[in-house]
C-alpha cells in the first residue's frame, strides 16, 4: 500500500498543470519536491541549447557561403585558362592532394584514382578541365608535349604517373607561354608549306614580261630593218649604177655620137626597180646626142660619176615617196 501511494504522488507531480495549478493528486504543499532544482536545471539547459543552435546556424553559413563563392569564382576563372596553365595552377596550390611536384620541380606527379575523384569528377561551376576522363586527360598531356617518365630508384607504381616538360617547372610560370599544342604547330607548318603561291604569280608575271620583251624586240628589229634599208639599197644601187655606167660607156664606144634629141621611152618607167635602168639608158642616149658623154668619159671620169650619183639620189627620193603597197605599172598591165 505504501508503494502505491508513493507512485500516485510521483505521477501527480509529473502531470501538467492547468492555469499554473496542479491537477488532482493532493495539494502542492502536502508533498514537497525532494529535488526542486533538478527540473529547473534541465529547463535551463534546454533553453541554452535552443538559444545556441539558432545563433550557430546564423553565424556559420555566411563564412561557408563566402568561401564557396570564392571557390566558384576561382574555378570559373581557372576553367578559362589554357590546359598547361590550369595544370600548373592546381599543382602549385596545396588544396589539391592528387598532384604535386617532384623533388627537382621539373615534373608533375599525379595519383590516378585521387585525381579522378578530386579534379576530373567536378561538375558545374566547380569544373576545371573540359574532360572527365583520365584517358582524355593523358591525351591532352601528350598533345602539349608532356613525356611520361618512371623513377629509377623506386618500383613502378601503377597508381602514380609522372609527366615532365622542359617548359613546365615549379615557380616559372613564364615558361608556359612556350608550350603549344601539336595541332597548332602542324597548322603553322602547313601554312609555311603553302607559301609558294606568290611564286606562281611571279612565274606568270615573268612569262608576260618575256612575251612583252619579244614583242618589243620584234618592233625594234622592224625599225632597224626599215632604217637599214637605204644602206642596203645604197650599195645595190651603186652597183646597178656602176653597171649602168659601164654599159653606157660601152654603148658610147660602140655607137657614134649623134645630135638628135633624147627620146622618151615607150611607157612610164619612173616607178619601181626598172626606173634605174630606164633613167640611165635615156640619160645616156640624151648625152650621146648632145656629145656631153664623150667629153665626160674621155676628159674626166669623176664628173660622170658625180652626175650619175645626183641622178641616182633624185630617183631614190622619188621612189621613197611611193607607198610600199602601191602596185607598179608592170603589175597593173
From Swiss-Prot:
Keyword annotations from UniProtKB, A to Z: DNA-binding, Nucleus, Transcription, Transcription regulation
Compositionally biased residues, Low complexity: 29-39
Region (Disordered): 1-66, 227-275
GO molecular function: DNA-binding transcription factor activity, RNA polymerase II-specific; sequence-specific DNA binding
DNA-binding feature ranges: 79-182
GO cellular component, one term: nucleus
Compositional bias annotation for Polar residues: 49-60, 228-242
Domain of life: Eukaryota
Principal place of residence: nucleus
Subcellular location: Nucleus
Keyword DNA-binding included in the entry's annotation: yes
Family: Belongs to the HSF family.
Protein name in UniProt: Heat shock transcription factor, X-linked member 3
Species this chain originates from: Homo sapiens
